[in-house]
Amino acid sequence: MARKVFYISDGTAITAEVFGHAVLSQFPMEFEAITIPFVETNAKAEAVKKQINDSFITTGERPLVFHSIVKPEIRDVIYSSEGLDYDFLNTFVAPLEQQLGVSAAPVLHRTHGKANHSYEARIDAINFAMENDDGQTLKHMDKADIILLGVSRCGKTPSSLYLSMQFGIKAANYPFTEDDMDSLKLPEALKRNKHKLFGLTIDPVRLQEIRQSRMENSRYSSLRQCRMEVKEVEMMFKKERIPYIDTTNHSVEEIATKILDMTGMERHMF
């Protein structure tokens, strides 16, 4: 049976989720996650406490509880549950207060709220990634921070969206399709922005598996076609001196981190 995990916050619970996922990913076992944001009143906290306690009674195992709760009175209710508490704010804030010699001034929703100065940049970047996904248009390439290239289904779209959502980076992406293979070359708008180009490639066998789930038993998803497209696009990357990475067996977080590391791009937000 999967171990029950709760991610709780009086805000969005994004911080608790990121913190918890980072820790639990180190353990080779299954977890059943429940995320509960906006626990802003004692009544809501008591309801969450009951949910945690019910889980303990049902499973016989104390649930893992990752939380980032600003209000002390809400936090105390969660502390009194049968869960095993992992408090992000108290774990790191108290030692920092000692080192910095300054008391923290917690503000609810500050981390991910609209008041954050990077909010507008994040929204602009997300909109840009969606409008410039999969080569829909080449009109805005001059405004892109980075342009991801690769064959269809190699991870361009999720990587673009992750870069925009997590770091506020305006990421466009452009696919090379079967129709491009006879005379594979960069469109003029991409040539003009060659310093922004970054390639993604993938193992042909893995690519076939992904394409089969979308268009089973088609030419598009045949191993022969996948091998040919990957080979041609990698040759073009080398010819044009476009840096690229293999996305096979890498998560979108790892892909994005490798892109940032190799390009030296500045993260617009943290």
From Swiss-Prot:
Domain of life: Bacteria
Family stated for the protein in its record: Belongs to the pyruvate, phosphate/water dikinase regulatory protein family. PSRP subfamily.
Reaction(s) the record says it catalyses: [pyruvate, water dikinase] + ADP = [pyruvate, water dikinase]-phosphate + AMP + H(+); [pyruvate, water dikinase]-phosphate + phosphate + H(+) = [pyruvate, water dikinase] + diphosphate
Protein name, per record: Putative phosphoenolpyruvate synthase regulatory protein
NCBIfam families per UniProt: PRK05339.1 (NF003742)
Protein role: Bifunctional serine/threonine kinase and phosphorylase involved in the regulation of the phosphoenolpyruvate synthase (PEPS) by catalyzing its phosphorylation/dephosphorylation.
Enzyme nomenclature, EC number: 2.7.11.33, 2.7.4.28
GO molecular function, one term: phosphotransferase activity, phosphate group as acceptor
Residues reported in the UniProt entry to bind ADP: 150-157
Keyword Kinase assigned: yes
Keywords in alphabetical order: Kinase, Nucleotide-binding, Serine/threonine-protein kinase, Transferase
